[in-house]
Amino acid sequence: MFLKNLSLTNYRNYETMSLSFDGPIQLFIGNNAQGKTNALESIYVLALAKSHRTPRDKELISWDADYATIRSDVLRRYGSVRLELQLTTKGKRAKINGMEQQKLSAYVGALNVVMFAPEDLSIVKGAPAQRRRFIDMEIGQVSPTYLYYLSNYNKVLAQRNQLLKDLAMKKSNSLEMLAIWNTQLADLAVKLLRKRFEFIRKLETWAQEIHTGITDGRERLSLHYVNSSPVTEEMTIDQAVDKMLAAYEEVRDREIMRGSTLIGPHRDDFSLKVNNMDVQTYGSQGQQRTSALSIKLAEIELIKEEVGEYPVLLLDDVLSELDEHRQTLLLETIQDRVQTFVSTTGVEGLKHQVLQQASRFYVREGKISGER
């Protein structure tokens, strides 16, 4: 897929901005706090209807405006698609070819992106919540049903947690209602888990191959899903639901005491190991960075496998930080197949091959010029 253009209105420090793109690499050059990261972020938001930097849409809207709009014409293998996302303080409006989508889950996936930013090291060394968010965002790009299940799971989870609090405070004694929530939550949990198991397995296959190449065969990367429940990938759906229901019963008293659901996808994690060593805890910064790069490059291949075409790649202030070997591997992965947007403070440290292929955009105080 290929972004033919990008138009922003009232997005962060861009009052208005309109660009056209040609060629495989788009290079955004500027000092810090000028808006180059905002430009890349807007593409991510257009694709996923949420930012990787903040959960608050209000921060994406210019301080003196009531709304922000992102538009782009995206070339897919089946033709051109016009995407438009409007952000307001009250919600989002998403359009595909001028038709408003009633649910964001029907919109997400029209454009697939992979973002690699300095904060993506949190995939390796951050908190479990950051890795859960990574899983949810990446599966959601290629599976609208996953987003639907996740949304429903979170709604039922909130209702169940409220009932557990009421039971703890003696405001309710309805164990029958708890059983109803258990049944609904178990069914949704199993649907999410089956998708997550499959995702981690496929991601590991690609990441292992890439990591082995980066390290010249010295290291083997493995990913392991850390499950808070007794559900396993080998179980049938019925077996998994029964296991989840039994697990809820087993921890019921503790959950009532704490007023919170203690097991399920919202408590899960995944671990990364290099040569059977926990890279999150014991890995060097170099090993953690290489593991993160391997996962990001694996995402590119996994999306291609799932949707039949390569995603757009967003490299936010990371390309110049990669040594020549890692830059070479990245370039070999993308070649002319992956449209890539790069933000950087300067061209020093970038391979000549990158500069040869790149269209350059100079960013200063929310204005972009110097396209060539």
UniProtKB/Swiss-Prot annotation:
Provide the organism lineage as a comma list: Bacteria, Bacillati, Bacillota, Bacilli, Bacillales
Q: Does the keyword DNA-binding apply?
A: yes
Keyword check for DNA-binding: yes
Protein's name in the database: DNA replication and repair protein RecF
The organism encoding this protein is Brevibacillus brevis (strain 47 / JCM 6285 / NBRC 100599)
From the UniProt record, report the name of the gene that encodes this protein.
recF
Q: Which Pfam family, an example, fits this chain?
A: SMC_N
For this UniProt record, the keywords arranged alphabetically read as follows: ATP-binding, Cytoplasm, DNA damage, DNA repair, DNA replication, DNA-binding, Nucleotide-binding, SOS response
Residues recorded as binding ATP, renumbered to this chain, are: G30, N31, N32, A33, Q34, G35, K36, T37
In the record, the note on similarity to other proteins reads: Belongs to the RecF family.
Which InterPro entries does this chain map to? DNA-binding_RecF (IPR001238), DNA-binding_RecF_CS (IPR018078), P-loop_NTPase (IPR027417), RecF/RecN/SMC_N (IPR003395), RecF_2 (IPR042174)
Q: Where is it found, in Gene Ontology cellular component terms?
A: cytoplasm
PROSITE patterns according to UniProt: RECF_1, RECF_2
Q: Any idea which GO molecular function terms this record carries? A: ATP binding; single-stranded DNA binding
Q: Which GO terms describe its biological process?
A: DNA replication; DNA synthesis involved in DNA repair; double-strand break repair; SOS response
Its annotated compartments are:
Cytoplasm
* Highest taxon of source: Bacteria
User: What does the UniProt function comment say about this protein?
Assistant: The RecF protein is involved in DNA metabolism; it is required for DNA replication and normal SOS inducibility. RecF binds preferentially to single-stranded, linear DNA. It also seems to bind ATP.
